[in-house]
Amino acid sequence: MTAVASSAPAAPIRVPAGTTAGAAVREADLPGRGAPDAIVVVRDAEGRLRDLSWTPDTDVEVTPVAADTEEGRSVIRHSCAHVLAQAVQELFPQAKLGIGPPITDGFYYDFDVEEPFTPEDLERLEKRMRQIIKDGQLFSRRVYESKDAAREELANEPYKLELVDDKSGDPDVMEVGGDELTAYDNLNARTKERVWGDLCRGPHIPTTRYIPAFKLTRSSAAYWRGDQNNASLQRIYGTAWESQEALDRHLELIEEAQRRDHRKLGVELDLFSFPDELGSGLPVFHPRGGVVRRELEDYSRRKHLEAGYEFVNTPHITKEQLYVTSGHLEWYADGMFPAMHIDAEYDADGQVRKPGQNYYLKPMNCPMHHLIFRSRGRSYRELPLRLFEFGSVYRYEKSGVVHGLTRVRGMTQDDAHIYTTREQMRDELTRLLEFVLSLLKDYGLDDYYLELSTKDPEKYVGSDEIWEEATETLREVAEASGLDLVPDPGGAAFYGPKISVQVKDALGRSWQMSTIQLDFNMPDRFELEYTAADGSRRRPVLIHRALFGSIERFFGVLTEHYAGAFPAWLAPVQVVGIPVADAHTPYLEEVAAQLKSRGVRVEVDSSDDRMAKKIVNHTNMKVPFMLLAGDKDAEAGAVSFRFGDRTQINGVPRDEAVEMIVRWIADRINEVPTAETVKAGAAK
């Protein structure tokens, strides 16, 4: 969620042999403790972060890392996690330590304790942490002579003992890594005696006083190493920042994010729900949510037809062999629901007369689209062939990661598969990226960057040469767009590299939206061919593309982006008529009929509530246009506009008001209407 500004990268400095990095930082007169941009660590020529106590053997050039950069904040948070662990073991001496990494905007630490932590426990821990920070304990790096020495020291820490031999490369495991096994001791600032310590590869800030602002946010249960077969531990989450101002800003964003939480708004606005009877991650859309979803899909359909896509439909289940051919059962089985074994026939004795077959709920639409391509001979004249489907797919997500609409088990993807020649590939990718960005902008999402996900060396199909060609092609197309491109090493699916569009919402949070995946492998597995101009048979290049990612996820992101106040063209109810008194209801019903004839979604509130209460109710339901009418309005054939920001436009002739509303909706204006913006629009 980080929306707090970061400082620009610092210029490199030189650290003479035998001198600490911290001394070089002071010699360069760079900001020290107490400044928001205090230098907390340095980065060496190999890109490794080093403590300020690091003393190189030769003269080296390093880059100072400030507290108000993402790397600097990560170091502060990691050190704050150590302070938390020290406080826990002081207040709960029987607690055993798990892992405690920095994470986006914060940190956590896992503990094996007898009872879950309470809010009162967190308050006590915060108080103790503040004292540790005030004491200015030193972080001191120490190298173990051997693994046996580490095991001896950590004999009473079973989870740390497991990590001593860890070779998983898990980025969350900050305890081990690199070519040495190290610990960080917290030393008394005056006596230099060891107060506490932890198995850790570092780096860390010089002293605890480099943590100017922190807060513990919550606690929860968590399985050791994220495996439900392991012990259940207690996890404490916290956040730490380079200044109190930055922390306050972050907490304000957290509060605003909670206000915008789509799960909360889904209930308040009657959009969707998650009935227990259906199971985790399986949402149902209510009529109001169905309107928004239909508008999202209908506009997308129209734009896809204009862009030359052909619509297809495929079933929700399939025989096992399809996913053997595609490789999903080999590489993606953990993300699929278990097989359904059906169609077996038995005789009177219960003996199998005809064996059954395994069927699977489809986790992806692509294999079925390949069958459509393969259903008849194809010519180069048909390419690029763009197949598109709003296809329902089902993926087994662990219950712990299912989250509202943004992480579900049953979803609908706006899924396209494009079959091109190699000669068409680059132009098609460029055209496709432009189409994706244009459509996202139409929905009001116009702040984005690109991410390039490359091969996972342990999980891929096809040759290295094909992967390299596909990756470089995507890289060139992405760079040509002029957008920022961020690497995602090892993040690709097993069948090809991808570009993903990372969208920033109104709070500055990044969401992965559209994906464009290049695939030279699947055409081989399905033996897809077309007849080239010279009569030869060739393999097409395959491009996988999902613009929304899934309708459900996109719906959730838009709900939070707009805080539930959808643009008028998407709003479930676009206009509500509010009579000053019951006598004015028939007049507003005439106005409503006029709007309905123009395709506007309109209601008239004829409830027994007073007018003021009705205005509050419909403001809370985030209806973009409220039309009020009393005696003067009805006599003059006019209405008064009321908007969510409490502004009004009084006495607007009804025909003019209808045209203003119809034009606003037809123009697909994404901002919330106000008296000022509607008047400005009417004046054009």
Curated annotation (Swiss-Prot):
Keywords: Aminoacyl-tRNA synthetase, ATP-binding, Cytoplasm, Ligase, Metal-binding, Nucleotide-binding, Protein biosynthesis, RNA-binding, tRNA-binding, Zinc. GO terms for biological process: threonyl-tRNA aminoacylation. Residues 1-66 form the TGS domain. PROSITE patterns: AA_TRNA_LIGASE_II (PS50862), TGS (PS51880). InterPro entries: aa-tRNA-synt_IIb, aa-tRNA-synth_II, aa-tRNA-synth_II/BPL/LPL, Anticodon-bd, Anticodon-bd_dom_sf, TGS, Thr-tRNA-ligase_IIa, Thr/Ala-tRNA-synth_IIc_edit. It comes from the Bacteria. Pfam families: HGTP_anticodon (PF03129), tRNA-synt_2b (PF00587), tRNA_SAD (PF07973). It is found in: Cytoplasm. Its main location: cytoplasm. GO terms for cellular component: cytoplasm. Zn(2+) binds at C366, H417, H544. Its EC number is 6.1.1.3. Residues 261-567 are annotated as: Catalytic. It is an enzyme of class 6 (ligase). NCBIfam families: thrS. Catalyzes the attachment of threonine to tRNA(Thr) in a two-step reaction: L-threonine is first activated by ATP to form Thr-AMP and then transferred to the acceptor end of tRNA(Thr). Also edits incorrectly charged L-seryl-tRNA(Thr). Homodimer. Belongs to the class-II aminoacyl-tRNA synthetase family. This is Threonine--tRNA ligase.
